[in-house]
Amino acid sequence: MTRQEFAHWQNKQTNNVSIDILPSAQNWLLLLTFDGAFYHGWQVQPDIPTIQDTLQKSIQRLTGETVRVNGAGRTDSGVHALNYTANFNSTAKNILTAEKWYSALNAVLPDDIVVKYVQSVPADFHARHNAIGKRYRYMICSQNYNSPFTKNKSWHVGQTLDLDIMRQAAEILKGKHDFSAFRSSNCSSLNTVKDIREISIGKSHFQNSIIQIEIEANSFLQHMVRIITGTLVEISQARISFADVKKALNNGDRNLVGCTAPAHGLYSLKVIYPDGLVNWPKKVIDN
């Protein structure tokens, strides 16, 4: 299905769809990958394309149901995902198995949103509320020209970065800290203390000019990964010092840390759940 065809059926009424209804709903968990370049983030917004809205309308097309798809968290416009989770409840009788949901959704979704796996989960499972951690990857392009193949998939810095200096700075950020200085001015989170479990920085196995920063934490503030990335880049450029980062963690001063890196370099890499709650086959998890 082309994007034009998808937009056409999105605007149609689905009130005439006839379906059988089960007495109780089944909770389904989706593992998704998507290119966020043409979407305004996850959450439904009036009259603009979002990932959540596209999924909900796809399910409505298949079953006639109006459902809410719960995502593992909000994403900004342009953010991508290699592994993102979302769940929804369905009472439709015409799609009863995970295999059928997998085939049906991939048949109607636009080609920049793909369902990688589907599994049934307990009725009280929620993709965001049950998560105990998340892992993100940020991609930086250091080559001196902006390649058309990485233009909307990475941040083009256009200069060589000192990865050793960046790794030393990352050590300061690891552990439990108040990350007030590393969040958007619009962030409304009441809990600004987060626990960064791991930060790794290295070059891509596929392209030497691509630098990958991976960050795992119990949860994140709005723009936190992007501001950490901007800070690590500016430390490599000698625009920010280690002392500035330490001060920012102590006093929450946003002016002491780096810029907010562009959204299009950010990828949702993994949503972490308690052992045994979600079991994805290893072959479907991208690294």
Go through each PLM region and give its residues.
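Structured-RNA-binding interfaces characteristic of tRNA pseudouridine synthases
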Residues: 1-287
